[in-house]
Design a protein with these regions (language model features):
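Nucleotide-sugar donor-binding catalytic core of glycosyltransferases
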Residues: 1-52, 59-61, 67-77, 110-270, ...
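Conserved acidic donor-binding segment of nucleotide-sugar-dependent glycosyltransferases
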Residues: 274-280, 289-294
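A charged, aromatic-enriched C-terminal amphipathic alpha-helix characteristic of glycosyltransferases
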Residues: 28, 292-323
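Active-site proximal beta-strand in glycosyltransferases
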Residues: 82-97
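Short hydrophobic patches on amphipathic alpha-helices
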Residues: 57-58, 82, 203, 287
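Generic C-terminal helix-cap and adjacent flexible tail
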Residues: 325-332
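Catalytic-core regions built around general acid/base machinery
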Residues: 78-86, 107-108
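Alpha-helical elements of Rossmann-like donor-binding domains used by nucleotide-donor carbohydrate transfer enzymes
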Residues: 20, 48, 52, 282-289, ...
């Protein structure tokens, strides 16, 4: 149960959930019954959408009901009806616990059999809310069925794929002023957004892929703006955190230069599998360094690629979820 389109808008293309979660589960060999709550609510209204969801769950009789809620699409009663009539344990992937645990997750997580979080700092909050027995710490990953090494030929020097939030434009300008022009794609940049295949190619064929934080300002995604409208959004700068990009770029065989964030060293050997920077000055210096050291850069990219395929694909993440539900962990 998730959005098929990015923020529910077909003009923006497939959603993260569609490109990563659904694609990975299908690649693992699982049969899925998809329900786009955003589209059904838009067409039929929220009340009717909830009825249709419960009916779909009853018809599917699936092994697990997996949710990626956006805001307040469902209430606890609907989730409990899905479990009761569908006969399957319910799971929600909580993507934003770093900023909306207290005014979102804490209220809806009790309705699920399992809450999956990517935020280690929220685990004490789950415990305090009496949810310690139903939370699983997971992490973003790479969907190996959608992100692959497509070429070993270099086509770009320094690239960034993402939106110009916070001080990103300023940082890009500083790198460019140091003699290293940065090619940028995404909503808000002149070049616009890449399609998925184009993005994968950029990751695979860039000397240096940048992963920039927007922690200098509050996040401003549509999910955040809707959350603010509902009284659930962050009001101040948020700490940097691990993102999907930390796994997607290495998963394409690309070299990643990313901001140092808490817990990243639990997933990679820093400096050996991905490169990290500590400040804008350090970033500018490292861009120059890595552009000049081809063999060392290639070794880091290859090590990161092997680490992702060995430990950090969505196959690994979903297998852990299935084990937590006592459904077994085989990917077949």
């Amino acid at each position: 149960m998730a959005m098929a389109n990015d923020y529910g808008n077909p003009e923006r293309g497939p959603s993260f959930e569609e490109t990563n979660f659904r694609s990975a589960l299908e690649g693992m060999g699982h049969e899925l019954v998809a329900f786009d709550f955003m589209e059904r609510a838009r067409v039929a209204g929220k009340t009717q959408m909830r009825r249709e969801l419960v009916a779909a769950a009853a018809d599917a009789r699936a092994d697990v009901a997996f949710f990626c809620l956006f805001t307040d699409e469902l209430d606890a009663g609907t989730i409990e009806d899905v479990r009761r009539r569908g006969g399957a344990p319910t799971v929600n992937w909580f993507a934003d616990d770093h900023w909306r645990f207290d005014n979102f997750t804490k209220n809806i997580a009790p309705a699920f059999d399992l809450a999956v979080t990517t935020d280690a700092a929220s685990l004490p909050k789950y415990e305090a809310a009496g949810l310690g027995g139903k939370v699983l710490l997971s992490q973003w990953a790479c969907n190996r069925y959608a992100y692959t090494r497509v070429s070993e030929d270099i086509e770009h020097d320094v690239t960034f794929v993402g939106q110009p939030h916070g001080n990103r434009q300023e940082i890009i300008d500083r790198i460019t002023a140091a003699g290293h022009p940065v090619e940028c794609w995404g909503y808000g940049w002149p070049a616009g957004k890449l399609d998925h295949a184009g993005m994968v190619r950029v990751f695979s064929t860039s000397r240096v892929n940048l992963n920039l934080s927007n922690s200098s300002t509050p996040p401003n995604t549509l999910r955040v703006r809707v959350g603010r409208w509902l009284g659930r959004g962050p009001t101040g700068p948020q700490p940097p955190q691990i993102k999907g990009r930390n796994f997607e770029v290495p998963g394409c065989g690309g070299f990643l230069l990313t901001e140092s964030v808490p817990h990243l060293d639990k997933y990679f050997e820093l400096g050996k599998e991905v490169a990290v920077y500590e400040s804008p000055d350090d970033l500018v210096e490292q861009v120059g360094y890595w552009l000049e050291h081809d063999d060392e850069r290639a070794a880091v990219a290859d090590a990161g690629y092997r680490r992702v395929l060995a430990e950090h694909t969505y196959d690994h993440r979903f297998e852990a979820i299935f084990r937590a539900l006592q459904l077994g962990g085989d990917a077949a």
